[in-house]
Amino acid sequence: MLRLCSKTEFERHADFAYELASDVTKSGYPTYCDGIKTKDMFLERARKAFACEEEQMLLFESGGRIQGFILMYWLPKDRYLSTSLFLTNTEIEEALSEFLAYAKDKFKGYDLFLGFPAENQLAVNYLERQGFACIEDDYNNTAYLEQLAPVADNKEVVKIGKENYTRFQLLHSQFEENMYWNSARLYEKLENWSIFLEEKDGEPRGAVYYT
C-alpha cells in the first residue's frame, strides 16, 4: 500500500530509510552509494519535501510493515514528474506498480522520469516490461580532488557564459533530444551551472557541466 508519509513517520524511520538509500540494489537515482554523500545530506534532502508544495514523501507498506519511501517532485510549468528518492526493501515491483498508478491518476499529462542503477535489476526489468525506454545510460564517477595532480593549463578548454554559449550549444544539441536539461533550460538557469568546453581546431569536442 502506498500512502502519504508524515514528517513524524519519516523521522521515526529515518535510519531505515538511509539504510535502504545506502544499498544500490534497493534504491534509485540519485545514489547515496557514491562515497561522497553523507547521512546528513540524505536527511537534509528528505526533510525538504515536507516544506515544499511541489514535493511529496510517500510511504510504501507491504505485509503490514513499512518497506520503502518515495520522494517525488513535479514541475507544473514543464509537466515534469520525477523522484529524488525511491527506496524499497522488498516487493519492488509492487511498489513501482502502485507508484505508476498513483502518478497516472494524480498527474495526468505529465511526463514521468525515473532513474535506477543497473544493480537494481528488479526495478530496471520491471520498468522495461511496462514499456519504459532507457533514454540515458550513465556512469557514476567519483573524483577525489585531493588526490589529483595539477596539470598545465589547457588553452583549448574554455569557460562558458552567456557571451559564448552558442559554442557549447553546438555540442549539447547533438545529445539533448530527451533530456530535461536541454540547451534552452540550461541557458535560462545558467547562473546555477558551471560549464567548461573543450575545443580542437575550433570544433567542440567535449564538455563538463555541473550544478
Identify the role of each PLM range.
Residues 87-153:
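Acyl-donor-binding surface of acyltransferase catalytic domains
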Residues 28-98, 200-211:
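Conserved donor-binding loop and adjoining core beta-sheet/short helix segment
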Residues 172-210:
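A mid-sequence, solvent-exposed acidic-amphipathic segment
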Residues 77-79, 121, 192:
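Short acidic/glycine-enriched loop/turn segments that link adjacent beta-strands
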Residues 49-52, 107, 188-191:
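Soluble sensory domains of the PAS superfamily and closely related sensory modules
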Residues 15, 55, 131-134, 193:
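Short glycine-aromatic motifs
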Residues 56-58, 79-81, 137-142, 194-196:
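Short beta-strand micro-motifs in enzyme catalytic cores
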Residues 1-41, 138, 149-180:
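Short amphipathic alpha-helix that is part of the acyltransferase structural core
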